[in-house]
């Protein structure tokens, strides 16, 4: 009996030490925790009708160039609101070089896209729908398509008081809808555990939380309710092999160099994705990308800005090795010295930041039978 009591005491002490270690790590940075209410801009208040309209538009192929790339084509609910590939499919005739990010919880970011090129969902929507390697839609043409559909004319009149649909209003509606694509804290093991349900998170995940906030140091960049500091770092990640090997990707990537205002030399030697540099034009920012949220990552692989890491096990192994070897890597990354069990524990905790089941929205019924000629 004395031996059993000793074991129980040791386990209790270990649990206390684990919690204390995690709390100490959290104290240095904004703590992890449930997401606050979704921020809503004063000039785009949310209503049920606006959200419903935005959902239809998010799914509607008519808001793209040739009718083949609606928003949902790269952000499928069943694929974690990404497209499931290492790099985004891109518009027909082009090939992208970055991973299609999940839009879950995108309402909480202060900068969107991997390189932080826009600061609101209202600005993000046209960048995607009209971007040459994404939707490639012409604004005036898409606007006229909406005006051919009586149901949309009536819906825009109801929501915005407009006689005719305008794309600025369409993008506002899409942004309102995206603000509903968020995690539910009651279905997230870590959030439930923090709220007092100590059975919500496994012992493995609890050990992983201590590592996350302590030895592994993940909390230094993945902090706050979003599990992201929303800053930009160069992780030394290798380029996706297709960047050097795929002619169509090279053509598209070099065209983008001109679009982003790089130098002639930068165009001629476009052998890497320069990331945040495209926004700042500061050479120190070459290869930097925004810290992604860790919420819902259980469902959003492949990972990193170019999808080169297929699983969370690979992600942890990458950081355990001290990151990659590409030029300009942040000095924040050092080898972690995690054991095999510690790596498993860390993955278990990161998965506990996702809901127990993926967030799924059913396809909406789209109005009208008019389609662009290219799709007929």
From Swiss-Prot:
Residues 1-24 form the signal peptide. One of its GO terms (molecular function) is heme binding. Disulfide bonds: none annotated. Its main location: periplasm. SUPFAM superfamilies: Cytochrome c (SSF46626). PROSITE patterns: CYTC. The keyword Lipid metabolism does not apply. Keywords: Heme, Iron, Metal-binding, Oxidoreductase, Periplasm, Repeat, Signal. Transmembrane segments: none annotated. Binds 2 heme c groups. Its EC number is 1.11.1.5. Pfam families: CCP_MauG (PF03150). It is found in: Periplasm. GO terms for cellular component: periplasmic space. It catalyses: 2 Fe(II)-[cytochrome c] + H2O2 + 2 H(+) = 2 Fe(III)-[cytochrome c] + 2 H2O. InterPro entries: Cyt_c-like_dom, Cyt_c-like_dom_sf, Cytochrome_c_Peroxidase/MauG, Di-haem_cyt_c_peroxidsae, MauG/Cytc_peroxidase. The iodate reductase (Idr) complex is composed of a molybdopterin-dependent iodate reductase (IdrA and IdrB subunits) and two associated peroxidases (IdrP1 and IdrP2). PANTHER family: BLL6722 PROTEIN (PTHR30600:SF10), CYTOCHROME C PEROXIDASE-RELATED (PTHR30600). Involved in iodate respiration. May play a critical role in detoxification of inadvertent H(2)O(2) generated by the iodate reductase IdrA/IdrB. This is Cytochrome-c peroxidase IdrP1. The gene is idrP1.
């Amino acid at each position: 009996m004395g031996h059993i009591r000793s074991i129980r005491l040791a386990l209790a002490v270990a649990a206390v030490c684990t919690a204390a270690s995690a709390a100490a790590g959290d104290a240095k940075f904004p703590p992890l925790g449930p997401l606050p209410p979704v921020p809503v801009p004063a000039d785009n208040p949310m209503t049920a009708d606006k959200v419903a309209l935005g959902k239809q538009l998010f799914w509607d192929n008519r808001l793209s160039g040739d009718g083949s790339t609606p928003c949902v084509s790269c952000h499928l609910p069943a694929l974690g609101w990404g497209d499931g590939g290492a790099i985004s499919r891109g518009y027909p005739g082009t090939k992208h070089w970055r991973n299609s990010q999940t839009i879950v919880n995108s309402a909480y970011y202060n900068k969107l896209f991997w390189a932080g090129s826009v600061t609101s969902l209202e600005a993000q929507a046209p960048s995607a729908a009209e971007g040459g390697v994404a939707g490639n839609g012409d604004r005036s043409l898409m606007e006229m398509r909406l005006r051919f559909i009586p149901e949309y004319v009536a819906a825009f009149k109801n929501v915005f008081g407009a006689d005719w649909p305008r794309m600025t209003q369409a993008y506002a509606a899409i942004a309102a809808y995206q603000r509903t694509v968020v995690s539910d804290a009651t279905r997230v093991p870590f959030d439930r555990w923090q709220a007092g349900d100590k059975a919500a998170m496994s012992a493995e995940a609890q050990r992983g939380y201590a590592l996350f906030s302590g030895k592994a140091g993940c909390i230094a960049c993945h902090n706050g309710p979003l599990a992201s500091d929303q800053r930009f770092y160069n992780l030394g990640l290798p380029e996706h092999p297709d960047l050097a090997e795929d002619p169509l990707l090279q053509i598209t990537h070099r065209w983008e160099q001109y679009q982003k205002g790089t130098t002639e030399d930068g165009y001629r030697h476009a052998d890497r994705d320069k990331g945040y540099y495209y926004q700042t034009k500061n050479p120190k920012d070459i290869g930097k990308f925004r810290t992604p949220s860790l919420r819902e990552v259980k469902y959003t692989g492949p990972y990193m800005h170019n999808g080169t890491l297929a699983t969370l096990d690979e992600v942890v192994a990458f950081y355990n090795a001290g990151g990659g070897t590409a030029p300009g890597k942040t000095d924040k990354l050092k080898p972690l010295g995690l054991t095999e069990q510690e790596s498993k524990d860390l993955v278990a905790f990161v998965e506990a930041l996702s809901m127990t089941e993926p967030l799924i929205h059913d396809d909406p019924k789209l109005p009208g039978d008019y389609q662009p000629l290219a799709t007929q």
